[in-house]
Each structure stands twice: as structure tokens, then as C-alpha cells.
Amino acid sequence: MSERVFDRELSEVKARVAMLISVIGQAYELTEKLLNTQNLSLVERIIDLEKESDALESELQKKASALIALHQPVARDLRFLLVSMNVGHELERIADQCLNISQRLEENSKSLPVDWPPEILEMISRTRDMLNSATAAYIQHDDNLARQTIGQDDLKTSVMHKYLDLINKKAVDPTRAVLFILISRHLEKIGDLARNIAEESYYLIRGEFIKHLRLPDLYH
């Protein structure tokens, strides 16, 4: 394979990741809309997007794996392919979490509508911001965006402990409380996956594993 052809193949890999990012962005946007409006007609579209993301991620893995096997790329190109495969995998897992959220609401349709507690409303917004900045770091090759995403506080909240305590005190509808706990866990997982994407992007750009750096080193 000539260098020009190989470069074109690398560009196609990045384009596939970009397509996957677009699909996951749509899936999260619809999931956020579903949470805010509790309009269950949105669930079917989220299911379709999850299936689309699964197919795109599978194509990406096959494409990148074939390039590694056939071309035996040099370090920089190998790093790009491996990172792109990892990012694709994390993106597909985000689609899974969006699907999980939609299914939770569908399962609890008789309990809807609900007023989400402030902690969950904050998680919805912060998760969106983390996902946007993490994916932009990969596309724009921006280590500053990667650092900003990695440096954000964890999305872990006191939702679980708060509502388990209220359930024990019989001070809340247990079905609704369990829904709050489950939704918060899914949002937390999306935030964790977004941080993983940012870490992969940082490694792609700087060639350093972020987990091996002390926090102050992120800003040097």
C-alpha cells in the first residue's frame, strides 16, 4: 500500500469516528430531551441510533484492525489507529447508556411524569458538556479540551444514599426513588466514558498516558 493510499485510509478511519460522534451526539440530545419532556415517542429513535452506532463501531474496528495487520504502521499512525478504536468502543458504550435511560423511563411509564431532583438536572447538563468537550478534543486534536474534560470533578452524587435513606424512612415513593438512582448511575457512567475518551485523545496528541501523570502535570 502506497503512503498516499495509506494516508487516505487513515482519513477514512477518522471520518468514521466523526460519524460515530455525530450519532452519539444525536442519541444523547434525544435522551436529554426525553428526560426533560418524558415524551416516550422519542424512545424508538434512540433505539435506532443505538443500532446505528453499533454498526458504525463494528465497521470502524474492522477497518482499523485491517490497516494494522496489513500495513504494520509506524508508531504515530499505530497510536492513531489504536486510539480511534478505543474511542469508537467508548462511544458505542455511551449509546448503550442512552438506550438504558430510555428503557428505564419506558419501564416506569406509569410513574411519569416526574420532577427530576436538582442533582440529576445538574448531571444531565454536566454530562452533555463533558461529552461535547471530550469528542471535540479528539476531532480538533486539542489537548487543552482533553485536559479540561479530565480535570472536571466526578459526576458521582449523593442521589443513591439520599434516596435509599428516604426509602428506609418511607418518606418517598420507592418506585420513583429507584428510578432517580438508576438514572443517576447511567448519567454517571456516560460521564466516566466521556472522560475515557478525553484520556485517549490526550494520549493521541501528547503521547502520554494521562493516568500516569500527577494532576498539576496536566497543565504543563
Which role does the model predict for each range below?
Residues 1-220:
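Cytosolic, long alpha-helical scaffolding segments
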